[in-house]
């Protein structure tokens, strides 16, 4: 499984049978994703203070477009690579939607439903 962070309202606009097309798809040609061990990295860097986020749990075998593991932008100092989805994300590829917010003391952590995967 791979994960994607987005606004709850953005995901709600994607009806069943629809496709999620964030701005990054037009801007850079792919949808930024993470895995269970790295979702906190982009969240901490880009989404501090946001209270409207969800974490999409995606089955990469159901996306129907290439998924490539590549360097982030900028590249992570430890060489961490991230999954990038090269096309729109079908609603049917999302197997879970989880509220995602900062924990007390700051920073993001996986929701408890995902923490032990």
Predicted feature locations:
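Conserved, structured core segments of small domains
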Residues: 1-117
């Amino acid at each position: 499984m791979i994960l994607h962070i987005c606004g709850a309202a953005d995901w709600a606009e994607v009806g069943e049978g629809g496709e999620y097309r964030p701005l990054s798809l037009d801007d850079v040609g792919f949808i930024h994703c993470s895995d269970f061990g790295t979702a906190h990295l982009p969240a901490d860097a880009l989404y501090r203070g946001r209270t409207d986020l969800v974490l999409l749990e995606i089955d990469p075998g159901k996306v129907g477009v290439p998924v490539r593991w590549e360097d982030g932008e900028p590249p992570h100092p430890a060489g961490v690579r991230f999954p990038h989805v090269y096309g729109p994300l079908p609603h049917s590829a999302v197997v879970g939607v989880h509220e995602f917010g900062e924990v007390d003391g700051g920073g993001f952590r996986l929701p408890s439903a995902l923490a032990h995967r």
